[in-house]
A protein has these predicted regions:
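Bacterial N-terminal signal peptides
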Residues: 4-14
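Carboxylate-rich, polar loop motifs that coordinate divalent cations or form catalytic acidic clusters
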Residues: 17-384
Length: 384
């Protein structure tokens, strides 16, 4: 890998400590991010690290020379030209600091938040936002993903169904549709929607807590574990390293697991719980599950991959394709690629990644990667 390093300290005017060697990357909890900071440079180091304190980085978006980082403490805009940055949070116009999605919709920077709806940056210089929430048509104020389809429709993944705004007419309430389990008669398998992607033929894929759904020709079809999604418990039970089991934290998640007949499985395993989604360059659909590994849909059936096949971890939090056609896979145990029908080398903290739990990623114009995890972002250049 060809790399350089640069540390961005969100520490209110004090540079970060010197970077440890790549073989000894251990990052103690950092102070809360502030609005000012300085930059320190270590040309000899392998990776670039951007520390964001005790925060999860759920979304990374590349916008020319700027990198937008969505965290549980707001959105950080970092400019690679001059190493400047700015924090947008509840103090500067967002209705919630928790950010799940950052991207451009209809040319404007758009943020999906945890409980604060969808906010659009109308004037970047002035920092003015316009927010769309339940009164405007959102199914829920918790927004996990947003997609602008080729036909102009805008899809919004919420925790109370999927919104479609026909023609992208966000300010016309009559153009807002909401698809739920109830009004699609089970076509949408679960109202908690975690991801959106567009297929090669314009079909829309939805990742939900109850499986995968596809919207095509005005109708929904869905797949769950019973139809081949996710690896069986017998295949993964010896390697469930990730300990966070949502069923132990909420009645909702416990009910989902019970409905699958998994209430007796006392580990973080639910193959219907799809938390990442991507359509690759060949049109195949990939779904990352909660403990059930990685599943690929070839147009007819689902094929699942686990740690026994070379996947670093069976919890797949992030999927991202690059310009070379590679699929990047972020798991609970590091990062890898899928290329040429096989998994590539595993990258982990031992190689210099900020953390092994990989939640988000964006690919730069030169093929460089910006990888989000708990506590920060790693910037690296993969091998040619």
């Amino acid at each position: 890998m060809r790399c350089l390093v640069l540390l961005l300290g969100l520490l209110g005017g004090s540079a970060l400590a010197q970077t440890p060697t790549p073989s000894d990357y251990k990052h103690p909890p950092m102070p809360e991010p502030m609005r000012e900071g300085k930059v320190s440079v270590d040309p000899a180091a392998k990776f670039t690290h951007f520390r964001v304190g005790n925060k999860n980085v759920k979304s990374v978006y590349i916008d020319g020379t700027r990198v937008w980082v969505g965290t549980s403490g707001g959105v950080i805009r970092y400019d690679t030209r001059d190493d400047s940055f700015k924090l947008f949070d509840a103090k500067s116009g967002l209705l919630s600091n928790g950010v799940f999605y950052v991207g451009r919709i209809q040319g404007k920077l758009t943020v999906g938040t945890y409980g604060g709806g969808m906010s659009v940056l109308m004037d970047e210089a002035k920092g003015t936002w316009k927010t769309y929430n339940i009164p405007e048509g959102l199914g829920d104020a918790f927004i996990y993903d947003v997609l602008e389809a080729k036909n102009g429709d805008i899809w919004i993944a919420t925790w109370s169904g999927a919104n479609r705004v026909r023609g992208g007419a966000l300010d016309d309430r009559s153009k807002w549709d909401l698809y739920t389990v109830e009004n699609t008669k089970g076509g949408v398998p679960n109202d908690w929607i975690y991801g959106l992607a567009e297929g090669r033929n314009g079909d829309i894929w939805l990742a939900t807590e109850g499986g995968m759904a596809r919207f095509a020709n005005g109708k929904f079809e869905n797949w769950n574990h019973a139809r081949g999604l996710g690896a069986s418990y017998d295949r993964v039970k010896a390697d469930i390293a990730f300990k966070n089991d949502p069923s132990k934290q909420s009645v909702h998640h416990a009910k989902q697991k019970e409905e699958m007949g998994l209430s007796g499985v006392d580990v973080a395993y639910n193959p219907n719980y799809v938390v990442s989604l991507e359509v690759d360059a060949t049109g195949q659909v990939w779904a990352g599950t909660w403990g059930g590994g990685l599943s690929r849909f070839d147009g007819k059936k689902w094929i699942s991959y686990t740690t026994s096949d070379g996947l670093p971890g069976n919890h797949v939090f992030m999927l991202q394709k690059d310009a070379k056609g590679r699929l990047w896979i972020g798991t609970n145990n590091g990062l890898t690629t899928w290329e040429g029908g096989k998994f590539g080398k595993r990258l982990s903290t031992a190689d210099g990644l900020f953390a092994n739990n990989i939640f988000s990623m964006a690919v730069g114009a030169e093929g460089d990667l910006w990888i989000g995890s708990f506590g920060g972002v790693t910037h690296l250049w993969p091998s040619k």
